[in-house]
Every structure is written in C-alpha cells, then in structure tokens.
C-alpha cells in the first residue's frame, strides 16, 4: 500500500517509527506523497484556465492533504536483495486531470537507505506537481524530549493555528525554531515547513537527530527539495505522542498549487526526480 516504508533498522536499532504488516500506518508513516505534499487549501486550485477541486482528505481543516497516492496500490516491478522498485500510475481524475507515472526506488547501501521518487508526465498536457516522503525518524528509546535536532534552515513558514495553512516566512530565531546548532527538543512543539536550507558542496542538505547516548539517525537529501516539513506528534496522537519526528523533504511548500511557490510544472514527457538517504549515527 502506497509504496510505504514500513520498517527500517540498523543492527537491531529502529531508525524510523514503523508499524506491523497488518496494521494501518499512523499519520502517513513512511508514505510517498504526490502529486502534491502537505496541505492544499479547500482542495481547490486554478491551473491554466480551469478551476479544479480535489476531494478533502483533511475535512476538519477543509484541506486536501498529501496528494493522491499515499494509500493507493503500487506494483512491485523489481526486487533484489538490497533494493526494490515500485510503480504507480495516476490516472486523470476529479480535480487532477493528468496522467503521471511514478516510480519509487529503495536501495540499501553502505551509507544507509536511499529513496528515489521519479515522476513522468505520460499525458499530453502540462501537469502541476510536487513530491515528498514522510518517515518518522527515531533516535532511540524514550521521548523526543531527550533528543537533539540539527538542521541548517534560515527561515520557517508561519501558519494559521486552525488550518495550518501558510501565512508568511519568518527567521527561525523569531519563534524558537532555530535548529542550526544541535538543539534540545525538550518541550518543543513544531508542525512547520522550513526553507533556505544549507546544501553542501555535494549538493546535499542534512538533518541529524541524536539521543542522549550520542547515537541516532540522519537524513540527507538533494537540491530537488528546497523545503523541509518537521512535525512532532503530540498528545492529540497518543500512539505517537513525542516518540518520533516526522521529517519530510519537499519539492514545494504547503499550498503550492495556489501560491505557485516552487511549483513544478511537468510538460508532456517531462520528468522530475528527488532523492534522499536515511543513515544511522553511531
């Protein structure tokens, strides 16, 4: 279901919050997100000369959340001892009248697990597109409050408190979301997108999540994702309450189908690829 990453561990130590083979995932655990990540206000947008409406999948906030494929059936096309490839076709449908072919590829290597998502516009009209991946990272046993997080992002996206839709960009230091140095997550509540990320000479941005013993997990991603969503589940989600951190590199911010910010428009035959790696820290 959904080409979802269900479990990932290193030497018996979980690197993500997983779930059982017969269980439903919590809050998009390990999901592939396309053709848009995050929230689309009212499920409504304009593309070209058409006003379009997709179903509301977060009805309590009047949003369409995380695209169309997170709970769709994908086809396993190739398997190797260290890799698997899955594919899914988005057929033209209500609110998204486009034909997209998606390929999700997972590969285990010496640096960890690398995930690649490729989108190809198989239709004959241009298509709006955004993508992301939604694992919940864990730095060991215990609570998020015992961990530290580091990611170099200069600005975050303020959201309205009721619908969690974008309001404006602000410096991270203005709201206690400055993780440019290793920062304790004790008492921190966050469900925001970050940008102005620091990409190194190899073109990678990196987030590090460490437990009190100095062990943890890292995620690195390429320039195809200039945005990062961070979310710490709270008491409203008792099964995951402060037990993991959702880390979601995104090609675009929330509601990009309306704002146009970093929105990808795939021409017929056009291709987009994003890639990230989850690695253990010892």
What are these regions (language model features)?
Residues 74, 103-105, 196, 261-266:
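Beta-strand-rich interaction surfaces with strong enrichment in secreted/lumenal proteins
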Residues 55-110:
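Extended, loop-rich substrate-binding clefts of extracytoplasmic carbohydrate-active enzymes
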Residues 4, 63-77, 148, 185-259:
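Acidic/His-leaning functional-site neighborhoods
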Residues 1-51, 57:
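Acidic-aromatic substrate-binding/catalytic surfaces of carbohydrate-active enzymes
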């Amino acid at each position: 279901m959904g080409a979802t990453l269900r479990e990932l561990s290193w030497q018996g130590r979980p690197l993500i919050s997983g779930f059982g083979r017969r269980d439903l995932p919590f809050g998009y655990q390990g999901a592939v997100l396309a053709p848009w990540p995050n929230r689309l206000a009212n499920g409504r947008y304009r593309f070209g000369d058409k006003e379009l409406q997709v179903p509301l999948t977060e009805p309590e906030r009047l949003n369409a959340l995380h695209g169309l494929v997170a709970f769709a059936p994908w086809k396993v096309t190739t398997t190797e001892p260290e890799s698997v490839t899955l594919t899914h076709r988005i057929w033209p449908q209500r609110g998204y009248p486009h034909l997209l072919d998606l390929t999700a590829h997972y590969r285990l290597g010496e640096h960890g697990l690398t995930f690649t998502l490729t989108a190809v516009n198989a239709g004959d009209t241009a298509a709006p597109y955004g993508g992301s991946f939604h694992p919940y990272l864990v730095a060991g046993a215990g609570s998020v409050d015992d961990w530290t997080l580091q990611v170099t992002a200069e600005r975050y996206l303020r959201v309205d408190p009721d619908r969690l839709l974008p309001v404006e960009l602000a410096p991270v230091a203005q709201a206690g979301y400055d993780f440019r140095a290793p920062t304790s997550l004790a008492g921190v509540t966050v469900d925001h997108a970050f940008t102005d990320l620091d990409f190194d000479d190899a073109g990678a941005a990196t987030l590090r999540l460490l437990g009190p013993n100095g062990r943890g997990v890292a995620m690195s991603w390429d320039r195809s994702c200039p945005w990062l969503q961070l979310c710490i589940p709270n008491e409203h989600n008792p099964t995951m309450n402060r037990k993991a951190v959702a880390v979601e590199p995104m090609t675009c911010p929330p509601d990009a189908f309306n704002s146009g910010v970093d929105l990808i428009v795939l021409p017929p035959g056009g291709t987009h690829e994003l890639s990230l790696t989850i690695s253990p820290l010892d």
